Amino acid sequence: MAALRSWVTRSVCSLFRYRQRFPVLANSKKRCFSELIKPWHKTVLTGFGMTLCAVPIAQKSEPQSLSNEALMRRAVSLVTDSTSTFLSQTTYALIEAITEYTKAVYTLVSLYRQYTSLLGKMNSQEEDEVWQVIIGARVEMTSKQQEYLKLETTWMTAVGLSEMAAEAAYQTGADQASITARNHIQLVKSQVQEVRQLSQKAETKLAEAQTKELHQKAQEVSDEGADQEEEAYLRED
């Protein structure tokens, strides 16, 4: 046992003396070992990061939103929104077109009234000039009328699409979308009806002005005939 202790003591002392004699070699071994394990640490860390990136993130599932009924309600809501937008745009265009037509009608009414008030006070040249203005206004009115009639056809198509979308929303259980679409349809119909009534009122005034102009002209011709007959009668006397 004493011999074993003596051998251990000598070995430790020899190792200590060895490290004191060759410190550079010992440090070199440490550096070599350190350099050896550095890439391994980097590799492990990089691989661990890549592993984390590759793990998919679980998303919360929404079983109710994936049902066929829910998907249909969502789709029909988008349809009602789209048809309502289309209806709004066509309604705006139609109202603007009817308003422009109504203005053109009132312009023609004013010209007819002025012409009627000047009957018998104009020479033939002045009368021709007034008639040229009236003809130009009539052409403008006809052009505006054709434009609004064309838009009216598109507007009626938009109304039909909105009504079908509202019905589809009702059938699929999207009650709120159906109610909103139907209320919107009623609103635009009332707006168009209001401007239509204004245009119809203008057309009535135009018809009255034209009738008055015809009566006035007929009266003027009759008066001229009576004057000629009276003049001829006086000549005979």
Swiss-Prot record:
Family annotation (InterPro entries): Smac/DIABLO-like_sf, Smac_DIABLO
Keywords (A to Z) from UniProt: Apoptosis, Cytoplasm, Mitochondrion, Phosphoprotein, Transit peptide, Ubl conjugation
Keyword Ribonucleoprotein in record: no
Signal peptide span: none
Modified sites of kind Phosphoserine: 222
Record's compositionally biased regions (Basic and acidic residues): 206-220
Compartments where found: Mitochondrion; Cytoplasm, Cytosol
GO BP annotation list: intrinsic apoptotic signaling pathway; intrinsic apoptotic signaling pathway in response to oxidative stress; neuron apoptotic process; positive regulation of apoptotic process
Residues at the site labelled Cleavage: 53-54
A UniProt-annotated Pfam family: Smac_DIABLO
Region listing for Disordered, in residue ranges: 206-237
Record has Methyltransferase as a keyword: no
Domain of life: Eukaryota
Matches recorded under Gene3D superfamilies: 1.20.58.70
Any one GO CC term of the record: mitochondrial intermembrane space
Subunit structure: Homodimer. Interacts with BIRC2/c-IAP1. Interacts with BIRC6/BRUCE. Interacts with BIRC7/livin. Interacts with the monomeric and dimeric form of BIRC5/survivin. Interacts with XIAP/BIRC4 (via BIR3 domain). Interacts with BEX3. Interacts with AREL1 (via HECT domain); in the cytoplasm following induction of apoptosis.
Function summary: Promotes apoptosis by activating caspases in the cytochrome c/Apaf-1/caspase-9 pathway. Acts by opposing the inhibitory activity of inhibitor of apoptosis proteins (IAP). Inhibits the activity of BIRC6/BRUCE by inhibiting its binding to caspases.
Similarity comment text for this entry: Belongs to the Smac/DIABLO protein family.
Domain notes: The mature N-terminus mediates interaction with XIAP/BIRC4.
The protein, known as: Diablo IAP-binding mitochondrial protein
Organism of this sequence: Mus musculus
